[in-house]
Amino acid sequence: GRSKINKLVDGSLKWKILQQTSDFSMPISLAFFSSVGYSHRSLNSIYGDVVRNFKSNEAHRFNYFTQLIIASKVTSWLSMELLPSYMHRNYIMESVNSNNKAMDVNGFFSMGIGGRIKFTKRVSFIGDYFYNFAKFYQNNDKVKNPLALGFELETGGHVFSLFFTNASGLIENNFITQTADSWTKGQIKFGFCISRTFAL
């Protein structure tokens, strides 16, 4: 995929490890997800105003995201996900949280939680939230944890996801690290996705 934010091009893979069974002999589904992002911004944009006492390095354009997707259809109307995740960015500009003096870090863990509540056969309420464990993201006035809430509409051939969120990016490499807006300040965006399953 490609995102305008940071001019990020990304590729990903997903591997299903376990499949939940209807009799709950296997109560969860488990999948491994990983993505690599490459920013094709100019090097001046990547390095910003930093005084460089090092050589420019093409590797600084890359970032990586890895996640386990632990999901369960708890009942006919409730599904839940836990998303332990790890983010690594090869290069970051120096930044300090003014509230706790913690420095931003290249790599850190986060935990996502997601859920779906089915109202009818075709209409569901959906939501997800990510909490970043690095001290830099705790009580930070400039960076917030991303939260999205919305509805999912199934029309037979397509699935429409309509949601409100404080995140700007659509892919993990952007929204986990760079969500600057706050729900409490009314800084909310509306977005939608359309999914279509093809069988060959």
Where in the sequence are the language-model features?
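Residue-level signature of outer-membrane beta-barrel architecture
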Residues: 15-17, 72, 117, 131, ...
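Outer-membrane pore/translocation modules
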Residues: 1-106, 175-185
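Residue-level detector of the transmembrane beta-barrel scaffold of outer-membrane proteins
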Residues: 12, 29-33, 79-81, 124-126, ...
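Outer-membrane beta-barrel "beta-signal"
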Residues: 149-158, 162-169, 185-200
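Repeated loop/turn-to-beta-strand initiation elements of outer-membrane beta-barrel proteins
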Residues: 20-23, 41, 77-80, 121-127, ...
